[in-house]
Amino acid sequence: MADGELNVDSLITRLLEVRGCRPGKIVQMTEAEVRGLCIKSREIFLSQPILLELEAPLKICGDIHGQYTDLLRLFEYGGFPPEANYLFLGDYVDRGKQSLETICLLLAYKIKYPENFFLLRGNHECASINRIYGFYDECKRRFNIKLWKTFTDCFNCLPIAAIVDEKIFCCHGGLSPDLQSMEQIRRIMRPTDVPDTGLLCDLLWSDPDKDVQGWGENDRGVSFTFGADVVSKFLNRHDLDLICRAHQVVEDGYEFFAKRQLVTLFSAPNYCGEFDNAGGMMSVDETLMCSFQILKPSEKKAKYQYGGLNSGRPVTPPRTANPPKKR
């Protein structure tokens, strides 16, 4: 689609019009518009580094997972672009009801504000994963499989990590035993699928674990877990202050690890309607002071759940290789 044919402003207006409407209200978009978003944003991703070097102030958000109403709440809280600069840590699609609206608004903002709005790749921005967990079905139901493949081409070009003011390392999952130098990330060629093992896989899939020293097996059946010692060594070696990552549900929307050397952000409150978690967003000011803005879980959703708030649901989901698909 030629640049002139994609009216990003019109699309953003439509996507924001559902604010205040009943949650889940579908936004009408044409296939040509959505395809245009994928093609144009892909060009921008490829024109920018795979390892982004960003400057504060900015706001950092974790997983969204198709919870479009909550994404709009985040922007209401943090300021709609370009009022604030944003970095999202991946996992835009799957599981929630409105992956299409979610990813389309994010891509539209990327096109409109390419130097102020940044998106990293999560493990769900990968065909083999979002084929299973909802995005493929949503694309097929509302458009067609060809459009899902166009999204795959776009996702294969997303940046993988970011460093804020040379001090805060950001990625979706975590560290890798293969990561010795930042140059290794810069050398990853795009477009690329996410391999089953190795550096790119680990950056999108690994998890911190307080019970591990060094590297451990990951219950997900993919990548590794890493201990506080690994975090400290990594920060020292690269003269960094903090690792900021997403990838796991945390009760308060953010959770520290390794004496505040790592923080997990998760920005989808009431995740999947199954958890009573809050959603968190981290604001980094010009002095690199970090503060947290929290979207509380809504009581309303919780009361419809079997057993109510005291049913003893775990804070984080069991991390199996193939979690059951909720239907």
UniProtKB/Swiss-Prot annotation:
One of its GO terms (cellular component) is PTW/PP1 phosphatase complex. InterPro entries: Calcineurin-like_PHP_ApaH, Metallo-depent_PP-like, PP1_catalytic_subunit, Ser/Thr-sp_prot-phosphatase, STPPase_N. It is an enzyme of class 3 (hydrolase). It is found in: Cytoplasm; Nucleus. It catalyses: O-phospho-L-seryl-[protein] + H2O = L-seryl-[protein] + phosphate; O-phospho-L-threonyl-[protein] + H2O = L-threonyl-[protein] + phosphate; O-phospho-L-seryl-[myosin light chain] + H2O = L-seryl-[myosin light chain] + phosphate; O-phospho-L-threonyl-[myosin light chain] + H2O = L-threonyl-[myosin light chain] + phosphate. Its EC number is 3.1.3.16, 3.1.3.53. Binds 2 manganese ions per subunit. Residues 305-327 are annotated as: Disordered. Mn(2+) 1 binds at residues 63, 65, 91. The keyword Nucleotide-binding does not apply. GO terms for molecular function: metal ion binding; myosin phosphatase activity; myosin-light-chain-phosphatase activity; protein serine/threonine phosphatase activity. Detected in gizzard (at protein level). Its cofactor is Mn(2+). Keywords: Acetylation, Carbohydrate metabolism, Cell cycle, Cell division, Cytoplasm, Glycogen metabolism, Hydrolase, Manganese, Metal-binding, Nucleus, Phosphoprotein, Protein phosphatase. Mn(2+) 2 binds at residues 91, 123, 172, 247. The modification N-acetylalanine is found at residue 2. It holds the Pfam family STPPase_N. Inhibited by the toxins okadaic acid, tautomycin and microcystin Leu-Arg. The phosphatase activity of the PPP1R15A-PP1 complex toward EIF2S1 is specifically inhibited by Salubrinal, a drug that protects cells from endoplasmic reticulum stress. GO terms for biological process: cell division; circadian regulation of gene expression; glycogen metabolic process; regulation of cell adhesion; regulation of circadian rhythm. The active site is at residue 124. Protein phosphatase that associates with over 200 regulatory proteins to form highly specific holoenzymes which dephosphorylate hundreds of biological targets. Protein phosphatase (PP1) is essential for cell division, it participates in the regulation of glycogen metabolism, muscle contractility and protein synthesis. Involved in regulation of ionic conductances and long-term synaptic plasticity. Belongs to the PPP phosphatase family. PP-1 subfamily. PP1 comprises a catalytic subunit, PPP1CA, PPP1CB or PPP1CC, which is folded into its native form by inhibitor 2 and glycogen synthetase kinase 3, and then complexed to one or several targeting or regulatory subunits. The targeting or regulatory subunits determine the substrate specificity of PP1. PPP1R12A, PPP1R12B and PPP1R12C mediate binding to myosin. PPP1R3A, PPP1R3B, PPP1R3C and PPP1R3D mediate binding to glycogen. This is Serine/threonine-protein phosphatase PP1-beta catalytic subunit. It comes from Gallus gallus (Chicken). The lineage of its organism: Eukaryota, Metazoa, Chordata, Craniata, Vertebrata. The gene is PPP1CB.
